């Protein structure tokens, strides 16, 4: 008798653009969850270079570069509260990537608020792989903008 319950995780981000750092987190998250919903956020506090539809398309295309065979994955956009988005997919886990201590303060506060709003949804932090700790979408955009 198999009583394994499917674990669904949400990996939210702006993904403007998606980077190898993001893909590293996706690949590693697939070792933890059975299904991963990669969710491009429409964030009113950020002014993304790419539209949400472009970001969703880029993520889907980028997933071809990595092994996601360990879990089912789906790519969607969202513009509501993360915990409401997680509930929509019956996700029990929010996956967040951390590059450095500077990321932790913000992520810690967000995880605390999400826990208050949805106590049954856990946040899991994955540290960036050592070779990707300096990768950031902001730097990628800046280099591309200056034809680097």
Model regions and ranges:
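Nucleotidyltransferase catalytic core that binds NTPs
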Residues: 1-148
């Amino acid at each position: 008798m198999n009583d394994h319950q499917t674990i669904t995780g949400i990996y939210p981000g702006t993904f403007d653009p998606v980077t190898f750092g993001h893909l590293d987190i996706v690949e590693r998250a697939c070792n933890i969850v059975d299904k991963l919903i990669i969710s491009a956020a429409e964030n009113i506090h950020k002014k993304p270079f790419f539209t949400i539809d472009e970001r969703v398309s880029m993520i889907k295309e980028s997933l071809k570069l990595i092994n996601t065979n360990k879990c089912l994955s789906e790519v969607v956009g969202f513009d509501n509260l993360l915990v409401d988005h997680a509930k929509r997919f019956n996700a029990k886990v929010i996956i967040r990537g951390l590059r450095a201590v500077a990321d932790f303060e913000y992520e810690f506060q967000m995880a605390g608020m999400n826990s208050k709003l949805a106590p049954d949804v856990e946040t899991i932090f994955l540290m960036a792989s050592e070779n990707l700790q300096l990768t950031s979408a902001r730097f990628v955009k800046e280099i591309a903008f200056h034809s680097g």
